[in-house]
Amino acid sequence: MNFKKFYNKIWNPASSKIKSNDVKFLIIRFSSIGDIVLTTPVIRCLRKKYPGATIHYLTKKKFATILQSNPYLDKVLLLEDNFNKTVQEIENEEYDYIIDLHHNLRTLRIKNLIRDVPFYSFNKLNIKKWIYTNFKINTLPQVHIVDRYMATVEKLGVVNDGLGLDYFIPESEKVKEGDIPFSHLHGYVAIAIGAAHNTKKLPVEKLKELVEKIKHPVILLGGKEDLSNGEKIAETDPIKIYNACGKFSLNESADIVRNAKLVISHDTGMMHIAAAFKKNILSVWGNTVPSFGMTPYKTNYEVFQVNKLWCRPCSKTGFDKCPLGHFKCMNEQSMDAIALTAETYLGKEIKN
């Protein structure tokens, strides 16, 4: 510890600084899209509790766009390829408190290297998840992950304001009228066809069946890796269905979700972005399960899953393909049920 830090610890201890609001926080969550969006209530509520505080957030570079327009943050730090450089940057910032919402080996290393800063670490419940996925015994608390994130900062006096998730889109990345077909300007259903793992995604043939049954214009959302599947689905009706996969940035895709009449999504980041905009969501689950505590937060939603499958959940994240080869958790999903629910929600939306 250098002399300046030593002086500050003696004459300006964190406990006294926090009472005066003259306090500096670092929040850590490296990935991924949905997980970072799910931490946004912590950012907002921390700011409400300590309006005069300095609040920074450390994440991976590819996810920085999720946070860079967040008005409750003062700075977004990027995880460097050189880990020691990241640790040095954290030390140079002289934080009073570090809020670890990732709690992995990297954050443990940070904690071990920066011993003079109080750490508040999120409980990931990995052992309980392992028991659930391997033995199908659910001992997880029936608590949403957002509320578990909030529990991490309870000792700092931070209280959940109940306002849900945040997602802020800069004006420069909002979608213009000319960016989507004229046929979709008066309303559309956004379907997020992607996911980080294939076992979280409906097969293309199932999605083709779904869009055939939906009577309203549809915009397909996903990354460049989903472009080919999007083209196959859009072939069903090229006028009704617009394949936006790989054509827009994350923030632009978020804006398309923001303006949608209804969002249909797998258990993925776009579902949580939709929840931030308080959209009605039809949430389709494959190998993962809602009881992991990551359903859409503080918005209207319906869950679609194949119940009473002995093999679910098979993973807390997902696989490239079904470990048993049958993929019943998605192949047995009813597209009639999803389409009927979609039309019900859309009917209410039009009447309003």
Summary of predicted features, one role per range:
Residues 1-352:
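Catalytic machinery of carbohydrate-active enzymes
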